[in-house]
Amino acid sequence: MSRVAKAPVAIPAGVEVKLNGQEITVKGAKGELTRVLNDAVVIAQEENNLTFGPKEGVANAWAQAGTARALVNNMVVGVTEGFTKKLTLKGVGYRAAIKGNAVGLTLGFSHPVEHELPAGIKAECPSQTEIVITGCDKQLVGQVAADIRSYRQPEPYKGKGVRYADENVRTKEAKKK
């Protein structure tokens, strides 16, 4: 049984929540997010709290309620504070630059790589080897960061490539003669 679903989600001041059946819309200073939740979940709004519970007679409804609570909590945090992912480029000649609504990457290929940013996602480059991705949708921020990382994942011998700032890449020892 999920214990996550038992904790209510607090709605801070400045955040507006609309319930329309199983569709929930959260609006705040950083943006607006909408999500359709599973039918096995019962949502109730009481003043400044959202409570989640299982629908009677549905298998794994507690698990679905816990998932729904975590998703809605991430929506509330996203529209108030936002989410950030930091990427670091390591390698000779590896560079990043913002070009309009895209991130331009030089990653040792014979051509530069341009990654278009979806709506609601912002990127900035504090230096040529750092990319900071921000947005209100946690899933989308993580997906954009993973897409950029996938162009050149860190290799295990020298650690060259695009990595998350907090990622620890295990390096292997080179072959001995």
Swiss-Prot record:
Species assigned in the record: Vibrio parahaemolyticus serotype O3:K6 (strain RIMD 2210633)
Gene Ontology cellular-component terms listed: cytosolic large ribosomal subunit
Subunit structure: Part of the 50S ribosomal subunit.
Gene Ontology terms: biological process: cytoplasmic translation
Name recorded for this polypeptide: Large ribosomal subunit protein uL6
Gene Ontology molecular functions: rRNA binding; structural constituent of ribosome
UniProt keyword terms in alphabetical order: Ribonucleoprotein, Ribosomal protein, RNA-binding, rRNA-binding
Role, per record: This protein binds to the 23S rRNA, and is important in its secondary structure. It is located near the subunit interface in the base of the L7/L12 stalk, and near the tRNA binding site of the peptidyltransferase center.
PROSITE patterns in UniProt: RIBOSOMAL_L6_1 (PS00525)
Pfam families cross-referenced by the UniProt entry: Ribosomal_L6 (PF00347)
Family per record: Belongs to the universal ribosomal protein uL6 family.
UniProt cross-references to PANTHER family, sorted A to Z: 60S/50S RIBOSOMAL PROTEIN L6/L9, LARGE RIBOSOMAL SUBUNIT PROTEIN UL6M
